Curated annotation (Swiss-Prot):
Record family assignment: Belongs to the radical SAM superfamily. Biotin synthase family.
Coiled coil stretches, renumbered: none
Name this polypeptide is given: Biotin synthase
Subunit comment: Homodimer.
Pfam family, one: BATS
The UniProt record lists the keyword Iron-sulfur: yes
Disulfide bonds, paired cysteine numbers: none
Lineage: Bacteria, Pseudomonadati, Spirochaetota, Spirochaetia, Brachyspirales
Cofactor requirement: [4Fe-4S] cluster; [2Fe-2S] cluster
Gene (name only): bioB
């Protein structure tokens, strides 16, 4: 056995790694890969300590509205809204701004901190841009909440326009690692995603970006994506668990276990210690609705319904996270 083999097989010290991270150290891919074999309870406990050190007990809670549904030109294999698959999902154009405003006001009144307008499709085009602009502008005028949006692969000009409407944060998931991305989608590329994220950042936007776990990717893929997000400076990272949708290519994939998700969340905390790790789609499949993940490094959530699947009520989520000792409060970007 070589010296390299001995080094790789040497059990990593979680406590030593925690202390290095607290002092500002960025863990390497090799160190992150060793965490895949670390004892789960110990790993999650130390990840929670790292979360407390950098983020205290602040919890970030957001909600979304499916403001344009279905008829998407892209072929993402997980997605109910792709026109490539016969999923029978709802199809409609941009919702009336009064409807978007109504749900936003309701969610803010229930205690949500951020409210995101999400639209299907590769990007917004023509009058769609003006319609979403008007909705964002109206929300900013008539509510005190923080407005976000997920608008696909806009260019810098499009992001600048939305910024002028008062938009501060844009969501654009990487979805997967560079290596695995082509197994998820072939109608746009990983670099298209990266370019859109950088265009939003250049326009002065804060970007929220993460991915979907359980699509057949390896642990190396998951870690590669976490490191990519760190390099992009992402401070809000949605971690979705695949919810297999009938008639999509991923319909028969077995969902991950809660222990899988706990380990993923914990490793993401080690790699991105200062970020808000946000449980997102698929959380409703977990028996504990994500409670164990909120003790394993996660400190944010999308609450309420997802885009095409039922979620967990705002009231239920608030009760759970407050019982865990969190304080739901907005940390300004």
């Amino acid at each position: 056995m070589s010296n390299i083999d001995l080094i790789i097989k040497k059990e990593i010290s979680l406590d030593e790694l925690r202390e290095k991270i607290i002092k500002g150290y960025d863990i390497t891919k090799e160190e992150a890969m060793q965490l895949v074999e670390a004892p789960l309870e110990d790993l999650c406990s130390v990840a929670n300590e790292i979360r407390k050190y950098f983020c205290s007990n602040t919890f970030d809670m957001c909600s979304i509205i499916n403001a344009k549904s279905g008829k998407c030109s892209e072929n993402c294999k997980f997605c109910a809204q792709s026109s490539h698959y016969d999923t029978k999902c709802d199809e409609y154009d941009i919702l009336d701004k009064e409807k978007i405003l109504e749900q936003g006001k309701s969610d803010f009144n229930k205690g949500v901190l951020r409210y995101s307008i999400v639209t299907s499709g590769r990007a917004l085009y023509g009058k769609e841009i003006d319609e979403v602009y008007d909705a964002i502008e109206t929300l900013n005028k008539e509510t005190d909440g923080y407005i976000c949006a997920s608008l696909g692969l806009l260019d810098e000009e499009g992001f600048n326009k939305m910024k002028n409407a008062g938009l501060k944060r844009v969501h654009n998931n990487l979805e997967a690692s560079r290596n695995f991305f082509s197994k998820v989608c072939t109608t746009h590329t990983y670099d298209d995603k990266i370019n859109a994220i950088k265009a939003a950042q250049k326009a002065g936007m804060v970007v929220c970006s993460g991915g979907i776990m359980g699509m057949g990717e390896t642990w190396e893929d998951r870690i590669d994506m976490a490191i990519e997000l760190r390099e992009l400076g992402i401070m809000s990272i949605p971690v979705n668990m695949l919810n297999p949708i009938a008639s999509t290519p991923f319909e028969n994939i077995e969902p991950l276990t809660e222990d899988d998700m706990r380990r993923i969340v914990a490793i993401y905390r080690f790699i991105n210690p200062r970020a808000f790790i946000r449980l997102a789609g698929g959380r409703g499949l977990m028996k504990d609705k994500g409670k164990s993940c909120f003790l394993s490094g996660a400190n944010a959530a999308i609450t309420g319904d997802m885009l095409t699947t039922a979620g967990i009520s705002i009231e239920t989520d608030k009760k759970m996270v407050e019982e865990l000792g969190y304080k739901i409060e907005l940390k300004e970007d």
